[in-house]
């Protein structure tokens, strides 16, 4: 016997929402999904009227749905935003080159300007070349650090007020688990924040899909017939995040609400005043925001350029110590020159 849509619209149910278990028709699902994102945006004051917002676009399901929904809500609720697409080309053959074609399709479909920046032009390296140097064990460290800074660089070039990323509820729950397992209190503090960064020296990042389940994002893209790229990064299978994702999926089988439970728990965490907070400043080399001197991107890049790519790996790597020592020696030489010039 056909099941009726729970919203009592008179239509037959076409799906069951993973988040609530409600049986809904497609139109009611679209309305509920979009309304929840609008509530997230408005209740968290993610944007202000007249702002220019860069949508971090990879061509995947999350960024494609984010671009589609932001354009829709911007028009429906008159946010008054100037939306642009910002994409980073890491230089991964057979993955990013193909996904960028989808990003260009997004540009045409949503009539948004698109800016593409590559690791090659920013750092002089592609991920293919980096992996050839270091192997596959730590490639996500390089890619993650470079990508975060590349988005900042692109946002600065575009003159935007904020960057909207496609992080969904599953991503955030996985990150909470990863930071707990690694004992990374610095990242654990801010990984559930819906808005990060900001201030005089950095461009804020916002997560409009923070409370949206990955399964529902896939369903929305499917029923809306959105064009997106679904191939996984060729280097991703070795990522540490994969273990957290598998663990989360196992937990979800026995407790369907576990994703939101973990996010809410992460939001409620409190740390003792004695726990040191990393102080964010400006990297003296590249001029971008960092919690260390020099920034991690500069440390990793220095290792690559010296032919010692693993120098920057680890919480307090050999590369960090080497560069810190060089900075100390440089400061001593400058001080000695000042004293010499005084005579």
From Swiss-Prot:
Protein task: Plays a central role in 2-thiolation of mcm(5)S(2)U at tRNA wobble positions of tRNA(Lys), tRNA(Glu) and tRNA(Gln). Directly binds tRNAs and probably acts by catalyzing adenylation of tRNAs, an intermediate required for 2-thiolation. It is unclear whether it acts as a sulfurtransferase that transfers sulfur from thiocarboxylated URM1 onto the uridine of tRNAs at wobble position.
This enzyme's EC code(s): 2.7.7.-
GO cellular component labels: cytosol; cytosolic tRNA wobble base thiouridylase complex; mitochondrion
Pathway this chain belongs to: tRNA modification; 5-methoxycarbonylmethyl-2-thiouridine-tRNA biosynthesis
Major subcellular location class: cytoplasm
InterPro entries found in the cross-reference section: CTU1-like_ATP-bd, CTU1_C, Ncs6/Tuc1/Ctu1, Rossmann-like_a/b/a_fold, TilS/TtcA_N, tRNA_thiolation_TtcA_Ctu1, UPF0021_CS
Any one GO biological process: tRNA wobble position uridine thiolation
GO terms assigned for molecular function: nucleotidyltransferase activity; tRNA binding
Keywords: Cytoplasm, RNA-binding, Transferase, tRNA processing, tRNA-binding
Pfam families referenced in this protein's UniProt entry, alphabetically: ATP_bind_3 (PF01171), zn-ribbon_14 (PF16503)
Name of the top EC class for this enzyme: transferase
Annotated localization: Cytoplasm
Domain of life from the UniProt record: Eukaryota
Name this polypeptide is given: Cytoplasmic tRNA 2-thiolation protein 1
SUPFAM superfamilies attached to this UniProt entry: Adenine nucleotide alpha hydrolases-like
């Amino acid at each position: 016997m056909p099941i009726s849509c729970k919203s009592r619209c008179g239509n037959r149910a076409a799906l069951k929402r993973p988040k609530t278990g409600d049986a809904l028709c497609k139109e009611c699902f679209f309305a509920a999904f979009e309304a929840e994102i609008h509530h997230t945006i408005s209740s968290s004051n993610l944007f202000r009227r007249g702002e220019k917002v860069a949508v971090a676009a990879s061509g995947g399901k999350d960024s494609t749905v984010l671009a589609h929904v932001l354009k829709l809500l911007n028009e429906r609720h008159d946010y008054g935003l100037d939306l642009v697409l910002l994409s980073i080309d890491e230089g991964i053959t057979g993955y990013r080159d193909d996904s960028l074609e989808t990003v260009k399709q997004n540009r045409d479909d949503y009539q948004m300007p698109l800016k593409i920046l590559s690791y090659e032009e920013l750092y002089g390296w592609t991920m293919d070349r980096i992996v050839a140097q270091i192997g596959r064990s730590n490639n996500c460290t390089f890619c993650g650090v470079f990508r975060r800074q590349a988005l900042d660089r692109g946002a600065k070039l575009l003159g935007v007020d904020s960057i909207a990323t496609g992080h969904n509820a599953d991503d955030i729950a996985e990150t909470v688990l990863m930071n707990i397992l690694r004992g990374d209190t610095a990242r654990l503090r801010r990984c559930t924040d819906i808005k990060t960064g900001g201030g005089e020296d950095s461009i804020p990042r916002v997560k409009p899909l923070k409370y949206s389940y990955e399964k529902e994002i896939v369903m929305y893209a499917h029923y809306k017939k959105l064009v997106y790229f679904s191939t996984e990064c060729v280097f991703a299978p070795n990522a540490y995040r994969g273990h957290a994702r598998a663990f989360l999926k196992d937990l979800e089988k026995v407790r369907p609400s576990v994703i939101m439970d973990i996010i809410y728990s992460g939001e409620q965490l409190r740390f003792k005043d004695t726990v040191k907070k990393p102080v964010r400043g400006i990297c003296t080399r590249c001029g971008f925001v960092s919690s260390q001197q020099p920034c991690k991107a500069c440390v990793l890049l220095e290792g690559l350029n010296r032919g010692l790519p693993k120098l920057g790996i680890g919480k307090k790597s050999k590369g960090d110590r080497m560069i810190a020592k060089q900075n100390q020696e440089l400061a001593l030489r400058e001080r000695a020159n000042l004293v010499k010039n005084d005579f």
